[in-house]
Amino acid sequence: IVELQFEKEKVSLKLEEEIQENKDLIKENNATRHLCNLLKETSARSAEKTNKYEYEREETRQVYVDLNNNIEKMILAFEELRVQAENARLDMHFKLKEDHEKIQHLQEEYKKEVNDKENQVSLLLIQRTEKENKMKDLTFLLEESRDKVNQLEDKTKLQDENVKELNKKKDHLTSELEDTKMSLQRSMNTQKALEEDLQIATKTIYQLTEEKEAQMEEFNKAKTDHSFMVTELKATTCTLEELLRTEQQRLVKNEDQLKILTMELQKKSNELDEMTKFKNNNEVKLEELKKILAEDQKLLDEKKQVEKLAEELQGKEQELTLLLQTREKEVHDLEEQLLVTKISDQNYSKQVEELKTKLEEEKLKNAELTASCGKLSLENNKLTQETNDMALELKKYQEDITNSKKQEERMLKQIENLEEKETHLRDELESVRKEFIQQGNEVKCKLDKSEENARSIECEVLKKEKQMKILENKCNNLRKQAENKSKYIEELHQENKALKKKSSAESKQLNAYEIKVNKLQLELESAKQKFQEMTDNYQKEIEVKKISEEKLLGEVEKAKAMVDEAVKLQKEIDLRCQHKIAEMVALMEKHKHQYDKIVEERDSELGLCKNREQEQLSVKTALETELSNIRNELVSLKKQLEIEREEKEKLKLEKENTAILKDKKDKKIQTSLLESAETTCQKFDSKTTPSQNISRISSSMESGKTKDNRDCLRTSAKILSTAFVKEYTVKTPTKMQMYQRENKYIPTGRSNKKRKTVFEFDVNSDSSETTDLLSMVSEEEISNRLYNNNSPNSHLTPKQTPLSLSTPESFVSLGGVRKMREDRWATIAKTDRKRRLKEAEKLFA
């Protein structure tokens, strides 16, 4: 009984030990269950995160759609503003055309009036000839009433003296005619020089147009190159999107397979005997993980290489930006050449305006001289011969004036042709600018799309990296679990050895257990084979995925580099577009105010023109009355001269008759000579004294008449010149006067430069500075200054002061303005580049 009790106690101890072992096993099972629950929770969290990611992706898509709608609205608004600006510009253009047509209509009316007045002058000349014939008849009647011989002798003496003086005057007038011919030759030479300058200007304009056409072809080639680049970028983005989709599908499949594997591992972890064999599998996995780490290092090296490639791409971007800057500079050069052509055309128009002002000044002088002719018209009794000569000269002058008119018309036609060419060039530039703007908008839209695609790709890549990190953490946890299980298995082996020593008595029971264990081993081997097959398949799939991931990473890095380049270009373009939009808005607002001012000023100018026309009409009427008076006086003078000629002829005949009678009467009157001598001496003394006084008075009067007659002749020439609107009046001044005029007109270059009515603003302006805005000098101020400088009182003096017009202070050289703009753009570009480089460094860090 005692022995049995001892045996029972031993058995009870063994049972207690086995119960403790069973409790430890139960604890291990609970721990594995806890790990499985943790894995379930992590999988649920990952599912929630995926749902959130999808929800956020939908939100981003909606935001992208809203942004696209806003951008389209902005584009439509900008196009509406542009259309409004073009409409305003066209309205102003039509108004200017209407004003130009009105001015041309007025010029045609003036020409018609001038032709009518010429016809009237021809009729008056015919009437004058008729009156001259009548005066001849009257002179024959007056010859019969003149019988006194002594008075006729005195008159013949005086007429001889007058003839001498007239010969002197003729000589003087011939010298003046030579001087005028020299001045005409000089004017012709100047006109030829102007024609040559115009030809040179036309040649330069043709050359510029050819160069611009070549440059436009280059721009079109550059456009085609850019379009090819854009298509390539689109193709690359499409391929990247397809690859990302395939990768997403593969990741989803891998996640499903991982879930299945986790369920199988949970089932197999309940069995303790499998842990021994699972140890080997864990070692294999460790080796595979080492290989994965080596591959990750390779990937890091490839990332470094990709960064180098990104740097090279940045260098290429800089080269492209430099090319764009050179193209922009070429565009600026073309604009400068256009401005030079505009300035040359303006100079030619200014020269024409100066000639018109000179004609107006000469008209004013003619008006003053006509006033002086009214006083001197009574003293023109003995100048009929000179008037005939001067009539011939006037015809010559009129022919010269007509020739000069024709030359002026040719010059005006050439100027109009140049203006038409300028308008064509401006239209071409505007069309080119519109094309650039459209291309910029298309590039913006494409870049926005590429940015959004790149952002989505980056987000997906980041999520994949996070998933990879999670998988790495899981692998590390599994490694730790495998190590713990291997330690636990070693401890179990030691305990089993102790139990084998103790279980010699229970070998029968163990045999039964061994049979069960053999069955379990067979099942384990079959499970191992299945597991190995699954692991081999998974390893192959993992290797394929690694290769595809490497390729995708390379492509993603390339896409990142391309996206960075596109983002940089887009930011630069956005900044420039924003600056240009702001400047265009400011310029449009300012130009609106200035257009209103211009319209008001043009209305005031039209009022002034109407007042001037009324004044000119009043002056024309006064001149016509004066012409009629002067012609009447000339007719009376011609009649008197014819009477005097007939008297001279009669006196000559009477002298011959008296000489014959004296020869016959000499013999008869020798005795009465002594008595008659005393009486004749007394009479002769009484007659000579008044004749001497008369000769002195006549000499003094004629010396004044010569000067006045010169003025009268000049006025007659100028009166005929005023009948035409665009004619040059030719004077016959002395040599001293010619020298004085040459000295006076030396500084005409400065006056021409200063004499400006400015109406300029930059079409291709990019900035809203004060120098690029309208700078104006109203024509009212210029007309008032011209009138003050050329007042009618000032023309009485021989000196003429040159016109001096003050230039406005707002004018600045165009070269300085462009340099300021280029410096500002350079500083803005430098700051933008620095900021972008800093942002890129932060992203890479």
UniProtKB/Swiss-Prot annotation:
Superkingdom in the source lineage: Eukaryota
Region Disordered, residue ranges: 684-709, 786-808
Locate the region DNA-binding: 657-845
Keyword Nucleus applies: yes
Q: Which GO terms describe its biological process?
A: cell division; chiasma assembly; lateral element assembly; meiotic DNA repair synthesis; protein homotetramerization
Question: From the Swiss-Prot or TrEMBL record, what is one GO molecular function term?
Answer: double-stranded DNA binding
UniProt xrefs under InterPro entries: SYCP1
Which of UniProt's keywords are assigned here? Cell cycle, Cell division, Centromere, Chromosome, Coiled coil, DNA-binding, Meiosis, Nucleus, Phosphoprotein
Which residues lie in coiled coils? Answer: 64-211, 244-544, 620-663
Ranges for the region named Required for pH-induced assembly of C-terminal ends into antiparallel tetramers are: 550-644
Tell me, in one coarse class, where this protein mainly resides. nucleus
Q: Which Pfam families match?
A: SCP-1
- Cellular compartments annotated: Nucleus; Chromosome; Chromosome, Centromere
Q: Where is the composition biased (Polar residues)?
A: 684-703
Q: Where is this motif: Nuclear localization signal?
A: 553-556, 753-756
Recorded GO CC terms: central element; chromosome; chromosome, centromeric region; male germ cell nucleus; transverse filament
Task: Tell me the segments the record calls region Interaction with SYCE3.
Answer: 59-215
Positions of modified residues (Phosphoserine): S676
Q: What is known of its domains?
A: The molecule is in a coiled coil structure that is formed by 4 polypeptide chains. The N-terminal and C-terminal regions exhibit a prominent seven-residues periodicity.
Q: How does it assemble?
A: Structural component of synaptonemal complexes. Homotetramer that consists of an N-terminal four-helical bundle that bifurcates into two elongated C-terminal dimeric coiled coils. This tetrameric building block potentially self-assembles into a supramolecular zipper-like lattice to mediate meiotic chromosome synapsis. Self-assembly is likely initiated by local proton density at chromosome axis, which is predicted to trigger antiparallel back to back assembly of adjacent C-terminal ends into tetrameric structures that anchor to chromosomal DNA.
* Role, per record: Major component of the transverse filaments of synaptonemal complexes, formed between homologous chromosomes during meiotic prophase. Required for normal assembly of the central element of the synaptonemal complexes. Required for normal centromere pairing during meiosis. Required for normal meiotic chromosome synapsis during oocyte and spermatocyte development and for normal male and female fertility.
Q: Which PANTHER family match?
A: SYNAPTONEMAL COMPLEX PROTEIN 1 (PTHR46918:SF1)
- The name on file for this protein is Synaptonemal complex protein 1
Q: Which organism is it from?
A: Mesocricetus auratus
